[in-house]
């Protein structure tokens, strides 16, 4: 179980405890991170220019499972939870997509891809 997530931005580190192990991951230009307790994952946004340009997902043991730039035409905005208590990333588009600028994207573990799950408002 992932516990005690700490973002140490000045040192570009994300740290957490998993069981008896202290996990420390280097994240250049760290912006933010959140724990997905439902799936036992750590989501991290990094490399802000000025908003984050990289999403990285780690398992509880600190192994990188997924890395992505934002979907085409969008920027990563922030991390939050959906109604299922899973971490999702909000992506913002300069031009409205189906009437909305901001959309929730979730990580599909089976397909190893981000998928748009609904408008963020």
PLM ranges: what are they?
Residues 58-59, 108:
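Structural recognition of the beta-propeller blade-terminating site
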Residues 19-56, 88-90:
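Short, structured interface segments that constitute the first stable element of a domain
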Residues 76-86, 92-118:
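Short, compact, well-ordered microdomains
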Residues 2, 25-39, 70-83, 118-121:
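Repeated scaffold domains used in trafficking and secretory/extracellular systems
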Residues 14-28, 63-72, 115-116:
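Aromatic (tryptophan-biased) beta-strands that constitute blades/sheets of beta-rich domains
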Residues 9-14, 50-56, 97-105:
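Structural motif
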Residues 1-16, 57, 80, 84-88, ...:
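Histidine-/acidic-rich catalytic cores in large beta-rich domains
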Residues 1-9, 38-49, 85-98:
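Short beta-strand elements that form the blades of beta-propeller/WD-repeat-like
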């Amino acid at each position: 179980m992932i516990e005690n997530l700490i973002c140490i931005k000045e040192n570009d580190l994300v740290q957490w405890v998993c069981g008896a192990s202290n996990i420390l991951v280097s994240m250049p230009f760290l912006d933010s991170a959140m724990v997905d307790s439902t799936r036992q994952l750590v989501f991290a946004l990094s490399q802000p220019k000025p908003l984050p340009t990289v999403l990285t997902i780690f398992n509880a043991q600190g192994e990188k499972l997924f890395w992505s730039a934002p979907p085409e035409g969008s920027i990563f905005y922030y991390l939050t939870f959906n109604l299922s208590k899973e971490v999702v990333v909000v992506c913002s588009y300069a031009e409205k997509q189906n009437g909305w600028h901001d959309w929730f994207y979730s990580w599909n573990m089976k397909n190893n891809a981000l998928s748009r799950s609904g408008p963020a408002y």
